[in-house]
Design a protein with these regions (language model features):
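Conserved catalytic or metal-liganding residues and their short signature motifs at active sites
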Residues: 1-174
């Protein structure tokens, strides 16, 4: 996790390490104890100590974050916190941040519209602020000219369509 020290890392990895002394030697030679990075790493059974150290030094791999329509922004923050490094309070603060809302023309009531339900590839330790920005980019990709035209054809706004979709999903899930 973010803020871990070398002993924390050893505690997490100890079930995978056959020779702890050898692992410490390799880690020291590569300068790992003084350069620990948070992230999501893939450690496979049978990897040797050098491969493990290389994986945790250089191998932060993306994770897939999934969420569906949420009725409340607090629910979304909780879902994200279960999948990523930051806690739900940090996500919630970022989603309600006035600068974020103003930057993208949102209000506290419409902030949830920035988050289009889907699966997204992000780094496990992405900051809530960077996650918000990524979701805004994804929202812009989703709301292309064709979709915006369709909302106008049925006399609805993007916000109304998103709200309606959330209601439909909630009702069909019953």
């Amino acid at each position: 996790s973010t803020g871990a020290n070398f002993n924390d890392v050893l505690g997490e990895l100890s079930p995978l390490i056959k020779d702890l002394e050898s692992f410490n030697t390799v880690a020291d030679k590569k300068g790992y104890p003084s350069n620990i990075k948070a992230g999501h790493f893939i450690i496979n059974k049978g990897m040797n100590n050098n491969e493990i150290v290389n994986a945790i030094r250089n191998g932060n791999v993306p994770v897939i974050v999934k969420f569906n329509n949420q009725e409340r922004i607090e629910n979304l923050a909780g879902s994200l916190a279960n999948q990523l490094d930051a806690d739900s309070i940090s996500f919630l603060k970022a989603m309600r941040n006035e600068q974020f809302l103003n930057k993208y023309g949102l209000t506290k009531e419409t902030a949830l519209c920035n988050f289009i339900p889907n699966s997204y590839e992000v780094y496990w330790n992405i900051s809530p602020e960077n996650f918000n920005d990524k979701m805004h980019e994804e929202s812009n990709k989703f709301w292309n000219d064709d979709r915006i035209k369709k909302t106008k054809n049925i006399n609805l706004t993007k916000t109304q369509v998103i709200s309606l979709a959330a209601i439909v999903q909630k009702e069909t899930a019953k």
